[in-house]
Amino acid sequence: MNKKVFVSGCYDMLHSGHIAFFEEAAQQGDLYVGIGSDKTINELKARKTINSDAERLYMVNALKVVKEAWINSGGGLLDFLEELNTLKPDIFFVNTDGHTPQKEALCKEMNIEYIVSKRVPHGNLPARSTTALRQECRIPYRIDIA
């Protein structure tokens, strides 16, 4: 039986960095993905999502490396607690941006292996982050003056 690997995040503006992260996590076993709800993201990041939680769920579930994805039911930084207790994963996989002492302590308490990955782009692709993409999107391609 394969190990259960859990990851959690926003996954708004899905990009090659997310895919590389999912592929790396899936090398450890069957990949389960918890997705932050629109409400949680708005509360944590004080902004609306580009893609609704329904769209993000559809896109993440469509990826062949993902065994199952869902919208996390809780709120705050540990919005996945209920799902984590239900899934009982063997591994909680995060990248350096997603690592927090609270997640690490929770995994120790629940006897879940906690793996912190470095952000490594796939092949010769550039490093990507949603924050950087959002900043690039703010630059207008043209300016209309009325």
State where each predicted segment sits.
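Nucleotidyltransferase catalytic core that binds NTPs
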Residues: 1-146
